[in-house]
Amino acid sequence: MIKILCVVGTRPNFMKIAPIINQMEKYNSAHSLKKIFEYLLVHTGQHYDDNMSDYFFKDLQMPPPDIYFGISSGTHSEQTAKIMIKFEKICFQEKPDLVIVVGDVNSTLACSIATAKLLIPIAHVEAGLRSFDKTMPEEINRMITDTLSEYLFTTCRDANENLKKEGIPKNRIFFVGNVIIDSLLKYKELADSKVKNLNKLKNKDYILLTLHRPCNVDNKKIFREIFEALIEISKVTSIIFPAHPRTQKMIKEFGFSCPFQKILTLNLFQMKGIHLISPLGYFEFLNLMDNAKLVLTDSGGIQEETTVLGVPCLTLRENTERPITIKEGTNILVGSNKDKIIKESFTILNDRGKTGKIPELWDGKASQRILSIIISKFNL
């Protein structure tokens, strides 16, 4: 038997760890006489809206966290330090054989550092992704975590090459596919059937917007440039904007509130305009994304999900650590340039957008491959 600590800190982490936990449960059920995996789910609480987290745990059929830190907000250094201190204590207490971290958030970095100093093996899910932009905090997190990890599970062959160029030995790199797509493919039909109230929206008759990165929402000049593009686009179609609490705060602070229409029911989205709503659960968001004409985002995971769904995506960033979504998928980088955002949006609205294909091994079986490798490496 192997004892594993699974770390999550933000909502995107939940979609990545859920398939791995589900697979561990399947393995244990199939080997009832000899339990293979003992795991604990550690939630650092890096995303501090408990209601938002609860929605995702429920939709993804995940058990509640075994350990919750409640770290909440703070600077990058404050969050990282607090998590390291708490996670080190958990490692001393639980004595895990392996720690699984996912993605590139501060929780990923903090738990990796604490784990490595105790000489406990680390498995990094989504290893090798690079934007080559060190002004992004996530890039620093990715690079350090990969250096410290014993098992690097990658989503694409580009990531393998990035790791090799950085001197990571080949025997630590494993191309397994994309776990967030495991969740998407598993729950897509369930989301469609459960979220019937959203079906009053006409399919492909609206744009879905997400915007949360500090480089976009904390900079008034950049936010205004994006905002002015949204106003132009919203003159011809509905833009649905499930806004993170922090983004809503910056909208008010910058005085951008007036053109946003706060809507309590999705039945009113037939109207043109920018419709600001509270954050959604996983099923609701997945349904909206799947049926959108276009998605505007600065998220990383959404670039991947839209590629698999075949939904055009415009990424409001100057670079991406997921270039495969551009080379093979439906994604286009538009940055924060107003004219480019408007031009590419109208191209898609006029049915002239790019089409893509599903990348290699994005087939819903990444978590199976990950656990097969762990079983082999630990001689289980």
Each model region followed by its residue ranges:
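Active-site and donor-binding regions of nucleotide-sugar-utilizing enzymes
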Residues: L5-V8, N13-H31, Y55-F56, Y68-G167
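Conserved nucleotide-sugar phosphate-binding/catalytic loop shared by glycosyltransferases and other
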Residues: L33-Q79
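Donor-nucleotide binding loops and adjacent catalytic segments primarily
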Residues: I36, D54, A191-N291
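A nucleotide-sugar donor-handling region in carbohydrate enzymes
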Residues: H47-N51, G70, L148-I222, V334
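Leloir-type glycosyltransferase catalytic cores
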Residues: F57, D158, I332-L380
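Glycine-rich phosphate-binding loop signature in dinucleotide/nucleotide-binding domains
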Residues: I90-D97, L201-K202, N291, K377
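A donor-sugar binding/catalytic signature common to diverse glycosyltransferases
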Residues: V101-V102, I113, H124, L152, ...
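Catalytic binding pocket for nucleotide-activated donors in carbohydrate/polymer assembly enzymes
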Residues: V308-K343, T347-L349
